[in-house]
Amino acid sequence: MRSIPVRGHAWKALLVAVLLLVPFPATATPRGAATWVGSWGTSPTTVPASDRTSFEDQTLRQVVHLSVGGPSLRVELSNEFGTGPLVVGEARVARRDGAGSAVEPRTDRRLTFGGRTSVTVPAGAPLLSDPVALPVQAGADLVVSIHLPRRTPGSTVHAFPYQDGWVAAGNVTGARDITPTGVLGKWHFLTGVSVSGRGGAVVALGDSITDGAETTRGANRRWPDVLARRFQEDRELRHLGVVNQGIAGNRLLHDPNPPAGHPAEGYANHFGHSALRRFDRDVLAQPGVGHVVVLLGVNDLGHPGTSAPLSEKVSAQDIIGAHRQLIDRAHAAGLRVYGGTITPFKGDTLGFHSPENEAARAEVNRWVRGSGEYDAVIDFDRAVRDPADPQRLRSDYDSGDHLHPNDAGMAAMAQAVPLRLFR
């Protein structure tokens, strides 16, 4: 089995330098104690070298969907992949009015950072806003508007939000509605919203299947979204938030590494740091986290020979070793950690499936189900596979590429999560 490096994060040191508020605890807060709870989050990545997107004297208006409500909130921005400072002229937050870019004026609030309305985020660092009194409900859409007065490369993004945002000229952060000059296909510089509450958060750590690939745009039908709605329907669990830290193309063991001249050079940077590398940032640092669901491994099997070199080919035992690292790190932080079985992909249009990869998937799934090393198992594979051909997705759950579940498949995955795990 190959050794698995555990790497540090430069952004943590920078966070200490600019920290304006008391940091969130890494372990769950007992129910009944006031705390900050992750209501929405996303994992940032960098962009390909060919992406020349930049903003200057423009407002970015972006929409996020909250999983749990509270009487106040705070917002996290990130300049993790910036090579220079991120200057924010003004930032505001409001509840969305309807399905477009308009906000409810009575809910409009200016964000401050250490009491300042304008702030500079150092290269490589995240930044938390001060708390703002704005009651929000679970399932609400929140609009975050950010004015960037100086030329700013769009270097820190989440590439596949399946949610439109907008860009407009000048500082129109306080406008009820804006006249867009363009549509944003990514989340830029925005990585988290937490609410004040007396509960905790569940982090979904995964790849494109968790990120929501091929689901209906703007409809919030990713399996973590559906799980959050299940929590809200349960009186004992409606205090829990769900934070989606899925990244399309993400792997357990390797960062993006497209072969020279391969088309993947134009998009692979969006796949993000390996789960082993990003675990502290995307799981342990999330506000109020008490539980984590891990669904990873399919890209470790499928990428070598497609968007990654064959030298990065891994075995089932390599994947199991990476899972064990995540389990140990979660337990060391006092978290409950649940393992998801890898879903089927026979006949996929991406070139992932082979007899060898299918055998490795089956071996990993046997270990997840039978080893007892995870605190519990969530059998996503069983939830979406075709009973007549278990190596395939059910046809009514298939988005069309035979790898990613559609909206109905996502709902089936969420229904496969036993709610008793969170009581």
Predicted regions mapped to residue ranges:
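N-terminal secretory targeting modules
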Residues: 1-9, 14-205, 210-219, 235-236
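Solvent-exposed loop/turn segments at secondary-structure junctions
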Residues: 81, 150-151, 208-212, 247-252, ...
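A cross-family glycoside hydrolase active-site/sugar-binding cleft signature
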Residues: 295, 340-341
